[in-house]
Amino acid sequence: MSEFRTFVLCGLGNPGLRYAQTRHNLGFMLIDYVRYTFSFPEFLPKFSGLLSSGRVSSFLLYLFKPVAFMNNSGRPLVQLVNFYKVELENVIVFHDDIDLDFAKVKIKRGGGSGGHNGLKSLDFNLGRDYWRFRFGVGRGVGDPAEHVLSRFTALELERLNKLFGFIGTNLPLLLSDIATRKEKFLNEYKCCSQ
């Protein structure tokens, strides 16, 4: 019997319809996409969040959306990580980033919060040694807080769907890269996005 490597994929966002489809909820949107794409079961309430799990390739995945507001995302995630005894090197957090141009992505392990309140909460509760998958939403014009709480335009949603499609198709490659410290996923993404 083969052994599955376990990963937690956590999307950051705020609960409620008021925040649905906003830039700050991009992490929730991606987790929803992965659940749907890989036919994982419906989310169930657990650890002050919504949890689903399933297998993709040789990986067991826990998909998680903390339903505490963004500023308190760390507590629910640390409960899940401790309960399932998942190493931080196997935790990937998907979140918006105003310092990246729209639809640009960066992946790194560790680092600072960059002023992102969800990451501040994770760093405080969990430590910093998890993977961060940063999605660019740009700065917009005016107040950054208003920008991240604004909804995506139809054109932006179309571009996000293409990006999510790429991530869904290449999720096993992303997980394998993280497991083996290679960068095939990022190289594939760079080729695809040019």
From Swiss-Prot:
Function: Hydrolyzes ribosome-free peptidyl-tRNAs (with 1 or more amino acids incorporated), which drop off the ribosome during protein synthesis, or as a result of ribosome stalling. Catalyzes the release of premature peptidyl moieties from peptidyl-tRNA molecules trapped in stalled 50S ribosomal subunits, and thus maintains levels of free tRNAs and 50S ribosomes.
Protein family membership: Belongs to the PTH family.
InterPro entries: Pept_tRNA_hydro, Pept_tRNA_hydro_CS, Pept_tRNA_hydro_sf
Gene this protein is translated from: pth
Active site: H24 (proton acceptor)
Catalytic reaction annotation: an N-acyl-L-alpha-aminoacyl-tRNA + H2O = an N-acyl-L-amino acid + a tRNA + H(+)
Keywords: Cytoplasm, Hydrolase, RNA-binding, tRNA-binding
Protein name, UniProt field: Peptidyl-tRNA hydrolase
